[in-house]
Every structure is written in C-alpha cells, then in structure tokens.
Amino acid sequence: MQRHPMTKEGADALQEELQHLKKVERPAVSNAIAEAREHGDLKENAEYHAAREQQGLMEARIKQIESLLGSVQIIDVTKLNPNGKVVFGSTVTILNVDTEEEVTYKIVGEEEADIKHNKISVNSPIARALIAKEEGEEITVKAPSGNIEYEIVEIQYV
C-alpha cells in the first residue's frame, strides 16, 4: 500500500470530520429515514429516497476518509530538521520577480491541498520548484503562460 504524506493538521481535520459524520450526521440521517418511512408508501416517498441517497453519500465519504487515514504518513514539520530549506509542511512566502506580488503557500499533501486557503500540493509545479531551496534563492516555475520567476522571501516551520 502506498503511503501518502499529510500534515498533522490535515490528518486532525480528517479525523474530526470522520467523528462528526459518525456521531452527528449518521444518526441524523437514520432518523430522517425512519421518519420518512412513517409516511407510508416507499415507492413514491421522495423524502425517503432523498434520505437514502444522503445516507449512501455519507457512508461513501466515511469509507473514503477511513481509507485515507489508513494510508497516510503524518509528517509534523515542527519535528523535522530542515536546515533552512523548504520541506513538506513548510509555509513559504515567495515574491513574483516581475509583478512584485508576494504570496504565501503551505506545502501539503494531495488530499489537503486547497488553493483558496493557500495550501498547495507537494506535487504542484510551484511546490516541486520550492522543495530543498533556501530563503533568498530564485526559482522558475513553468506555467501555461510561460516561465515565472519567484524569489523565496521567508520559510516558516509551523
């Protein structure tokens, strides 16, 4: 079985979601199904069919999370000795050399990547260019619009 890297924060969030699904959502859906059953004929009972569909989706998500948690390798960046280099779990501030625009990214596993929250996958082009680099170094990222030059401004291990 292939192990997938994940930050401790990402694994904790998945564990929390799993507990919520099992302890809150699952009983609520079971109650909704029982309540819909009381309305009689199940063939034409839209509430019943909707609740069963919701149950199926929820159970699939529970299985997905359990499978994920069973195959992750949790990496706690605070326990690493990165020697000032960008590593998995680092939070990196970079400066676009052309536009002077600064952006901060946290390098995380595939399953926890979320660009809206500036969490990028370790397999993304930017993260691959950043890994093992130090503050002050410049990197080149190949983008559809051409190469983009960045300078590493700051590396944090939180």
Curated annotation (Swiss-Prot):
GO terms for biological process: DNA-templated transcription elongation; regulation of DNA-templated transcription elongation. It holds the Pfam family GreA_GreB_N. Keywords: DNA-binding, Transcription, Transcription regulation. The keyword DNA-binding applies. One of its GO terms (molecular function) is RNA polymerase binding. Signal peptide: none annotated. Gene3D superfamilies: Transcription elongation factor, GreA/GreB, C-terminal domain, Transcription elongation factor, GreA/GreB, N-terminal domain. This is Transcription elongation factor GreA. It comes from Hydrogenovibrio crunogenus (strain DSM 25203 / XCL-2). The lineage of its organism: Bacteria, Pseudomonadati, Pseudomonadota, Gammaproteobacteria, Thiotrichales.
